Amino acid sequence: MRTLMSATKNNVYSVSQLNSEVRHILEGQIGKIWLNGEISNFSAPSSGHWYLTLKDAHSQVRCAMFKGRNQSVRFKPVNGQQVLIKGAISVYEPRGDYQLLLESMLPAGDGLLAQEFEALKLKLAAEGLFALETKRPIPTNIQRIGVITSATGAALRDILHVLARRDPSIEVVVYPTQVQGATASQLICQAIVTANQRMEVDVLLLTRGGGSLEDLWCFNSEHLAHAIYNSALPVVSAVGHEIDTTISDYVADVRAPTPSAGAELLSKDKGNKAEKLALLLSRLQQGMKHYQLQQYGRLTQLSHQLQRHEPQHKLQQFEQRFDEIQMRLENALQHKLSRLTLRHQQLHNRLQQRSPVNTLTLEKQRLGYLIERFNDASKDYFKQAESRVSQAAHNLDTVSPLATLSRGYSITSTNEHVIENANQLSNGDVIHTRLKQGSVTSTVTDVSTK
């Protein structure tokens, strides 16, 4: 295979060859990693695959989690959520983007514990604590069982109930201890040591009921693992529910999925051989787990080599490309729909503006406005006219003869001619005098021009 440093003018990479070569380098040299960060740009198209961006305060990386993997995730990721993910570095060749192909995803709190759990499991496996050849056989004729658990917990009640039903002759010695909290692991170790010092039981049943990963964390202690491994008494681990797995399950001689199952495993049911089969199955499970753990590293290495020639990578590339095109198409359709909706609204508004009803309404409003202006103008006009008439009347009254009469003057006339000068009269003429109130008819008896 060519290396990137070998390219010359006569040996030039194509873009596709470059992206393929970079993918092989990243997948071969880095492989799978754990990564902690915040989810953003999460999308879950109809194909069932998940696409997201994992970021911190300074950087981000794209991630893809295909349907076969994300079905095991116990929560629905949301933007802004802190998570711990495990994935393999790869390159999405069509775009030349490097990305993580995710295998698992946990909430940040559980994720850190799970990462610590995996690290401790690998360490103890390397030390040989899980080796099948170190497992102690469980006695076939058990007379007395030592139960290490809480004296007030439901697990002890379940165990006593099962033993009373299946084999009441079995005695139970309880080594009470805390099974949750910061000091629980140390107290459980002390209970195992005490039981080994007394040697009064045939087998130890280490147990408690179900709970969260934090609740069961005391059973993932390295000190507890060594205490179980160093015990002279056989130890059966029956912690939590069937889906829960602890370090004590790997180190113990036999693992039972529940406290009740542990009691059934260690008791006989009127000659029923089912418990023997269950014991063998449990031992087989332990052996398989150990074998799987031993082969994990080799399988991982072979997996990386196989991926270079496996069509699954191409299929994932095609699926991711399909999802990318589908999301782009959906976004384009949504954009087109938004534009059509906006255009429809604009046309609707224009139609409303030109509607006869709206036009009539606007004309009515305009007519009302004109009528109001006409009324106001009419009022102003008549008011001004009234003022002018009043002023004219005043002016007329000022020059009116009647106004003169009202000030004590009179008008004298003869034969309908106003007498302005005494020379116009002679003795014996009949004259008419107009007063403010009424008139007087007189006969001239004397005329004076002075």
UniProtKB/Swiss-Prot annotation:
It is an enzyme of class 3 (hydrolase). Pfam families: Exonuc_VII_L, tRNA_anti_2. GO terms for cellular component: cytoplasm; exodeoxyribonuclease VII complex. It is found in: Cytoplasm. The keyword Hydrolase applies. One of its GO terms (biological process) is DNA catabolic process. Its EC number is 3.1.11.6. It comes from the Bacteria. Coiled coil: none annotated. It catalyses: Exonucleolytic cleavage in either 5'- to 3'- or 3'- to 5'-direction to yield nucleoside 5'-phosphates. Bidirectionally degrades single-stranded DNA into large acid-insoluble oligonucleotides, which are then degraded further into small acid-soluble oligonucleotides. Heterooligomer composed of large and small subunits. PANTHER family: EXODEOXYRIBONUCLEASE 7 LARGE SUBUNIT. Belongs to the XseA family. This is Exodeoxyribonuclease 7 large subunit. The gene is xseA.
